[in-house]
């Protein structure tokens, strides 16, 4: 077998040619490097022992699932498709995504000072365009067409570009934010406190949302805002296939989980109304 560093470099090139996103490449190479350093061999039996080792060290099924994806890609890279097929991911229970109510989104926006245009825009883009946090941070000025009200999300999950229409209100917010900036950064959102205006980091987005969420009394994450976008669209009667395209889901089944959220929303509304109970009580 080649030296681990040499193998990892070749594996990175393979993943790039496969069209994997930079985030996926980083994740896969991290786990494969750990596997090789652990002394893993090129077979599913060795990989299963590695997974058992990780489980003993506290890895959840969800985390192990990511490791399996990385190792299967690595085995295919080595031309061992049969070994890749033998390596099955552990079952991960699919929990319903948690969405904020519209009132909670309003509360969140209300605690952001008017002078913090960037912070307000972060919330509006995650909720109003359904972006992933990595997509938000990677947006460049050239990806936004304010006149036509469009955002081009480049290299989303699966390294696929998609076009997301935005309402005039959101386009105006973007324009106001850009007019308040004097830097020459190519990125739509930048770090505020640094002299050199680098692109905004995902970690800072999480931090900002946590801080504003505490002020508003709302538990919020970037994913929750994206989930809220999808759930509220569905509640307004938007076709699920349109929501699939807006979210950038390759499979409709991934989007269909939101129908369960909406059914629960309807069930609660029905239980609150108590129509039958009131009828039978009369």
Swiss-Prot record:
Job of this protein: Site-specific tyrosine recombinase, which acts by catalyzing the cutting and rejoining of the recombining DNA molecules.
Top-level taxon: Archaea
Presence of the UniProt keyword Cytoplasm in the record: yes
This protein's name: Tyrosine recombinase XerA
Places the protein is found: Cytoplasm
Gene Ontology terms: biological process: chromosome segregation; DNA recombination; DNA transposition
A matching Pfam family: Phage_integrase
PANTHER family hit by this protein: INTEGRASE_RECOMBINASE PROTEIN MJ0367-RELATED, PHAGE INTEGRASE-RELATED
UniProt family annotation: Belongs to the 'phage' integrase family. XerA subfamily.
Residues of the active site: 132, 157, 223, 226, 249, 258
Keyword Cytoplasm in annotation: yes
